[in-house]
Amino acid sequence: MKINQWLLNTLSTTLILLMAGQLDAQSLSDISFGTDETFEVVTWNIEWFPKNGTATADSVGRIIESLDVDVLGLQEIDDTTLFRQVVNNVPGYELFIAEGWFGGLAYVYKTSTVNIQSIYKIYESSLFWNPFPRSPLVMELTFMGEDIVVINNHFKCCGNGLLDMGNSSDEEYRRYEASFLLKEYIDTNFSSSRVIVLGDLNDILTDNYANNVFKVFLEDPTNYRFADEEIASGASTDWSYPGWPSHIDHILITNELFGDLSNPGTEVQTIKVDDFMSGGFSSYDYYISDHRPVGMKIQVTPASVGFVEGSNTHIEIFPNPTHGKVSIDLTQCNAPTELSITDVHGKSIYTMRCPKGEVIDLNVEGPAGIYLVSLESGDTKSVTRLIKE
């Protein structure tokens, strides 16, 4: 039977419109990741935005608003004018887009929690175009009074899986060289700073040593760690790039954040936006991107935690971690003690003046997370971290 071509075209157009309607009707607004108690950062390649016109733009705006995170590092933004309109329609967020022929890198950040110190590109010279076809984009920011550095990247794609050291035309070597130069820059300029390196790094963490483009970081576990390493070595259903099943979008941290990474409330995950769309990943890939976002949320411990001045106070806190009830042993203190407990944002939870030489029993109210126990006794002051599970 011969089918009228006009009818086929009409049915095809109708199907696309119905899919778009389903997309609008689905629960993108139910996506969530950010909280008031944590710092959240997300890397997301949105595949030369907009992949499918206004449907893409509308959906990306809803996703950004629903994620409710502090910082998004984005790659592959083609229509910068349209993307700026999208972000302008998301309450409480601002946009920075890198300029340049092969840019496509951007930051979207929450203005109520993130104070930008500076944003700039590094390795811009033509000498570095081979390892960095897109110059890394550095954001120096302050979150709740704490300094954090984020470096957004989009490494060279493709290759054959074999690292040919010294071959400047080898894609794996170009990614290796980019990793080497990034580490060199961080070691030189941010040796004691909290640094988060993120982006579409276009390679997997689990390659053998000989072919691993990230070996310079993996060889220095004292100072660097991939926060998403468990995802990389886990089930393929959780990977960031399902079309060619692999996990190639990463979040790397420096040792100043190791403690925060292990704290209660920390989460690192591939955010499966496709789970909130009726067509699953096929619909997500059609309308939005072939990459899923990868996010990390942590409770940032103030840099002053652990600071002690004066003589040893011989104070013990137990159990630590706790589920709420805690005892603070002041029996070795020979003077009355001012005790205060705050959360990591400085909100007062408990204050009291304690007689010398007592054990104080308390119930720490509030959600699981990090609390700071401050004690002043005579001319001695200490700040100790208390973890509530």
Stretches with model-predicted labels:
Residues 1-27, 305:
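Bacterial Sec-dependent N-terminal signal peptides
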Residues 71, 77-156:
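Structured beta-strand-rich core segments of catalytic domains in phosphoester-bond hydrolases
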Residues 23-90, 100-104, 179-180, 194, ...:
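N-terminal, active-site-proximal structural segment of metallo-dependent hydrolase catalytic domains
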Residues 45, 154, 199-200, 291, ...:
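Active-site glycine-centered loops adjacent to acidic/histidine catalytic or metal-binding residues
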Residues 26-29, 80, 118-120, 129-133, ...:
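Metal-dependent phosphoester-hydrolase catalytic domains
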Residues 53-72, 134-238:
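Extracytoplasmic, non-cytosolic globular domains
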